[in-house]
Amino acid sequence: LAKTNFPLNFPIHVRDAGVQWSPLGRLTTGADVRHEIPARVGHRLARWA
């Protein structure tokens, strides 16, 4: 697997996981997670706003 290049201030437990399964069932790399987490949080905040 390719080494992920998370920023140093990214949560350690997320960085160490590196590759995770997303709820959509597809394999996500670190780069995907960085984009999916803010999108998910933004969607949730928009729903509750």
Curated annotation (Swiss-Prot):
Presence of the UniProt keyword Glycoprotein in the record:
yes
User: PTM details?
Assistant: Glycosylated.
State any single GO MF term: carbohydrate binding
* Keywords for the protein's UniProt record, in alphabetical order: Glycoprotein, Hemagglutinin, Lectin
Q: Is Glycoprotein one of the keywords UniProt gives this record?
A: yes
- Function of this protein? Beta-galactoside specific lectin. Has a hemagglutinating activity on erythrocytes.
Q: How does it assemble?
A: Homooligomer.
This chain's protein is named Agglutinin-1
Species? Pomacea flagellata
Lineage of this protein's species? Answer: Eukaryota, Metazoa, Spiralia, Lophotrochozoa, Mollusca
